[in-house]
């Protein structure tokens, strides 16, 4: 059978969120219950029983590991008074009666909690104090970031206000406006750029004796054609022709209309003269005489009709055994020769050909013309 203490602990653990005060209860009885509570509730229970802060250091170590895992969990100080002052201030703030009545009890509790570490000969900072220190640093960083954000938003708002359009009352603007024409006073100082341009202008006037360029005067002098080039024509201006309206007669119909049209003078248009200059020399160039090779065709194909065989013909043997080919070529060529090109014939095909095969010196007007003839026996 379980003891009464165990049953009470089980009941309190089941309802740990409803615990409001643990005054005058020692820590060893509340250890299992306090392990279930969270930080806000633990702070509230510590205020109801101030002596718990001397014993619940292990609970704050767990909270420190959970909330600040990357931070250092153990820190040391060389002065003991800092830690003692922290404990006494907490007791004085939450239970002032105990602070004044039981000083000996408080000193004994502090003596047991604040112990020098043998390894570095310093005093370890309590985990509750270290947790509050880290928490204050985080809150301070959050406040600084919030302040920076607030300043940035203020700057943006000021820039928007500067660029914002403002509606102006036109009546007030026209009342304040000075209608008199304001002029610059002579004794008022001018800008450096204005003074520099003024000095340059004065030096330019000294350099040119005529006093500088005057746009009203026409300085350009015409030299070509006696000074008349580019100007107006010297011929007298012809005034507009005055046309006297003639009274319209009803009796005349078409004849009067045509006569009136002839009487009306048409506006004089300038006569277009042809350019007297010679055209460019590049336009007189003739097309180059290119040599065009004539296709070599069989004489039999170009002359389908045949002529009679005479004694003047030369007979040649044909490579085919069943056909006797007789060719006769006249001293005058049948194909026309293009202008500028001299066509030569081989001496074996021309009667009385020269040594170089040219037949033109031996051609006569009365000479007989001969053509190639192919003899094909009947089948």
From Swiss-Prot:
Keywords: Phosphoprotein. Residues 351-379 are annotated as: Interacts with DEF1. The keyword Methyltransferase does not apply. Transmembrane segments: none annotated. Residues 231-240 have a biased composition (Low complexity). GO terms for biological process: nucleotide-excision repair; transcription elongation by RNA polymerase II; ubiquitin-dependent protein catabolic process. Residues 1-143 are annotated as: ELC1-binding. GO terms for cellular component: Cul3-RING ubiquitin ligase complex; cytoplasm; elongin complex; nucleus. Residues 19-63 form the F-box domain. Disulfide bonds: none annotated. InterPro entries: Elongin-A_domain (IPR051870), F-box_dom (IPR001810), RNA_pol_II_trans_fac_SIII_A (IPR010684). Residues 225-248, 260-279, 291-379 are annotated as: Disordered. As part of the CRL3 E3 ubiquitin ligase complex; polyubiquitylates monoubiquitylated RNA polymerase II subunit RPO21 to trigger its proteolysis; plays a role in global genomic repair. This is Elongin-A. The gene is ELA1.
